[in-house]
């Protein structure tokens, strides 16, 4: 009696960068010949990952985070690789076994935030303005003019030229949020932001400006209880990295990733006749993968009571 062939028993197929590039080059009728070919392909892959962030929510890049809110602090840094926030709540009585509650906090625009008459009013936050910034750290001409202790909330600089009225700075390895500028002083500073540690800084320490993605809440948190800002976000896809790295992409997107890279590489070659075919293959592969990459929970729409029976 013939025996049935056995399966591999594994489900771990993946490709590293070198294999991905080789497959993509073969699809355009070529092969990797030089180190520059590999470098060019890696650059194209990173550009394609940036484009994917513009195509909607990629489920594998979703994660969650928690920010402990502090009385009097309006703005809090998000991780540097944040693309956008998908949902958010204000948590009260955090870590309580019986009284913890997640309460709605509404996202508002910069225009709405600008019209708030008293931005430092304190209470439980009910609105949030999300600043989708580029995470760049830029040098300034400023230096520390007077020694800074680890608990100081006022910092004197040699100059504040180029610094906005409020924002984040980096001195040595510490990120600091300052609430306002008065003369050459930064006032109402909150120390050790963005997972850094408050430290002392000597006269002459260089000051960098950090354009961090962040959230600004209103009202400003009070001290009635401990509040947490709990969020779910979409992060950037990790860089392609070196030749032995696998990509930060689920296996379902491997065909799409290779088809996309082949299309990008095809645009760099002299054989433009293949380009429409490569684009069609990429579009089809993306559509198949994207259709599967979504939540499958049921959606229920309920009209507001005020609109039921309305003649409008």
Question: Positions of the model-derived regions?
Answer:
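Autoprocessing Asn-cyclization modules and mimics
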Residues: 59-71, 100-106, 133-208
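Glycine-enriched, solvent-exposed interface loops adjoining structured elements
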Residues: 1-138, 208-312
């Amino acid at each position: 009696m013939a025996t049935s062939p056995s399966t591999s028993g594994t489900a771990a197929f993946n490709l590293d960068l070198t294999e991905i590039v080789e497959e993509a080059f073969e699809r355009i009728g070529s092969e990797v010949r030089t180190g520059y070919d590999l470098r060019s392909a890696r650059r194209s892959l990173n550009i394609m990952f940036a484009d994917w962030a513009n195509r909607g929510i990629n489920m594998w890049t979703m994660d969650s985070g928690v920010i402990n809110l502090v009385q009097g602090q309006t703005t809090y840094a998000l991780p540097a690789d944040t693309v956008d926030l998908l949902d958010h709540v204000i948590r009260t009585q955090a870590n309580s076994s019986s009284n913890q509650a997640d309460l709605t906090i509404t996202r508002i625009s910069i225009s709405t935030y600008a019209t708030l008459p008293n931005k430092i009013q304190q209470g439980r936050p009910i609105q949030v303005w999300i600043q989708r910034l580029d995470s760049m750290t830029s040098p300034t001409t400023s230096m520390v003019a007077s020694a800074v202790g680890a608990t100081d909330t006022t910092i004197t600089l040699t100059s504040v030229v180029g610094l906005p009225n409020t924002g984040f700075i980096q001195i040595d390895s510490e990120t600091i949020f300052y609430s306002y500028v008065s003369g050459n002083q930064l006032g109402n500073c909150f120390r050790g932001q963005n997972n850094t540690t408050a430290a002392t800084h000597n006269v002459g320490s260089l000051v960098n400006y950090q354009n961090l993605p962040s959230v600004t809440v209103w009202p400003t948190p009070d001290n009635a209880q401990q509040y947490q800002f709990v969020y779910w976000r979409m992060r950037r896809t990790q860089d392609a990295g070196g030749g032995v790295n696998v990509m930060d992409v689920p296996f379902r997107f491997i065909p799409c990733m290779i088809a996309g890279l082949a299309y990008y590489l095809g645009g760099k070659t002299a054989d433009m006749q293949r380009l429409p075919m490569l684009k069609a293959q990429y579009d089809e592969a993306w559509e198949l993968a994207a259709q599967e990459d979504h939540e499958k929970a049921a959606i229920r729409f309920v009209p507001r009571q005020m609109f039921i029976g309305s003649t409008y």
